[in-house]
Amino acid sequence: MTARPSAPTAVDAVARALRDELDAVRTRAGGSAAPRVLDVGGGSGTWAVPLAAQGCEVTVVDSSANALAVLRSRARDAGVADRVRAVQGDVDALADIADGNGGADLVLGHGLLEYVDDPVAAVRALAGAAAPGSAVSVLVAGRWAAVLGRVVAGRVAEARRLLADPLGRWGAGDPLLRRMDTDEVRALLERDGGLVVEQVRGHRVLADLVPETPDGPSGAADLAALEELAGQTPPLRDLASRIHVVARRPGPR
């Protein structure tokens, strides 16, 4: 399903979850230090720059030099260049990049697990980069939404292959290495990452099905409320374009 910029409600829900976590970090620290965020695969700074604008110290790790150049430019334009650190590397290098003071207060792996060769190793690296008691936020492409999206578009053969494929791919030309469902993401984080899953939400459940932004003064608010509720309600949650999971590394906060 193709995302439309006119329906940002699901992104707002993810941002709210991150903001709530960072508020808790600040409360525990008594406001004495800026929260430390590690954004793995953060590319051009979609999440990093807004988080830096909220007062966080953000390290972005990405293998693309071009994406990191865009990140630096966006950070300068937003006036937060001093709070954004760009590191060229991949998830395998996290052990060398991690702070020497115990890890990050929040680790992001948004749009990461779809592309890595070894998702188990990636999740373990994300978990290891988080400080004890800190959260890991994962956003990953949903399998069932991709099936439905292709059916609606008339690409039935692709939908059948995607549904039957163990990795949720429609063929050799698929740009993603995998798509996942909520159970798969939860198992990966808990079993392989040793994390405790606290939140599972659908990201863009129904917004992409709305032909245009609803009319009227309450239209956008109604869509936002519907998306918020659907993202928490199985089985609608499981049909989301992406699955958002917040999990925590065990240990004292």
What are these regions (language model features)?
Residues V120-A135:
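A short glycine-rich, Lys/Arg-flanked "PGG" loop and its adjoining helix->strand segment in the class I
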Residues P8-A33:
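Conserved alpha-helix/loop element of class I SAM-dependent methyltransferases that forms part
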Residues D174-G193, V200:
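Short alpha-helix
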Residues Q199-R253:
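Conserved Class I S-adenosyl-L-methionine
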Residues A33-G41, A135-A164:
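Conserved class I S-adenosyl-L-methionine
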